[in-house]
C-alpha cells in the first residue's frame, strides 16, 4: 500500500507540473488532463470492486502493481527522446487512472480480510501509512525541476515494483463469501449499487464523497497548479510545498484520530470538516502571499483527514461481508468519479473568471450539499459503530 501511495505522491506533482509548467497549457487543458487521471474511475471502480469481491486480493494487487510500472517507464522514454506532448500525457493519465480504479477496491477489501478486530483503528493506521508514503513521494517529486522528470519516473516505476514484491510476501487473501451461481460481474455491480442505495448509513456518505470529488478534489488538482504558476511564478518546488502542507495536515488529522480512537459521532465530524473545507476554499479566493496559501492548504488537509478516515470507517462497518469490496469501491468512486467532473468544470471556470475567483463557486456548492444532508439524511447523527 505504501509503495502505491509513494508513487501516487510523485505523480501528484509530476503530472500537473508537466502539463502546467513544462507544456504551459491553459487552465481548461490542465483540467482536461487531470480529468484523464480520474475519468476511468467512473467506468471501472465498481467493476474493480466486483472483481475483488470474488478473487484473491493479494494476487490482484501483485498484478496491478507490476502493470503500473509500464506507464511511467513509457513516459520516461518519451521525455528522454524529446517527444513529450499534451496527447502523450492524456494517454498516460488514462492508463494510470485505469489501474488506480482497479487497485483501490482490491486494497480496501484486503484490509478487511486480514483485520478481524478494531477495524476503525486499522482504517486510521492504514490511512496514516498511506499518507506518509504519499508525502515522501511529494517531497521527492519537488526536485523535478532540478533532477528532471525522467529520473523521477524511473523511481516511480521502481517503487511500484517493490510494492509488488512486498505484496507477494503476504498470505493468500481469497474471497470469504459465497456468491450466487451464475451471477455475472455486471449483476454483481448492480447488486452493489442496490445495496448502497438501500442503506441509510452508506447512502449519505457516498453523496458527501461525490460532492468532495466535484467541489474539492476537482478544484484542488486544477486551481492550485494554475495559482502556483500564474499568481506566484512557481514551479515543481512551490507546487510540492503546497501539496506537502495539504497532505501534512491530513497526516496530522489521521494520526490524531489513531491516538484518540474511534469517534462516536463520525457523521457529524465529517460534516463539520466539510464545512471547514468550504471556508478554506472561499479564503483561497482572496489574494495573499504564498505562505498564506500553504497555511490554508494545511487547514484544508486537516479536514480532509477527518473526512477520509471517518467516511471510510462508517462504510466499512456498515457494509456486509458479501458486498464490502463493491461498497468500498462506490465510496472511492464517489470522490474519484466526481473529480473528473470537477476538474473539467474548474479548468474552464478558471479560464473564464481567473483561478482565485473560481474558488468561491465550489465552496458555495458544498455548503448547499451539506444543508441537504443535514435536513434530508441521518448523517449528522450517524455513529461509527
PLM region descriptions:
Residues 14-22, 75-81, 136-156, 230-231, ...:
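Transmembrane alpha-helix termini and helix-breaking/packing motifs in multi-pass membrane transporters
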Residues 31, 86-94, 206-207, 290-298:
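The feature captures the transmembrane alpha-helix scaffold of multi-pass secondary transporters
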Residues 42-47, 54, 58-60, 64, ...:
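C-terminal transmembrane bundle of multi-pass solute transporters/carriers
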Residues 109, 113-114, 153, 159-183, ...:
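Helix-loop junctions on the cytosolic side of multi-pass membrane transporters
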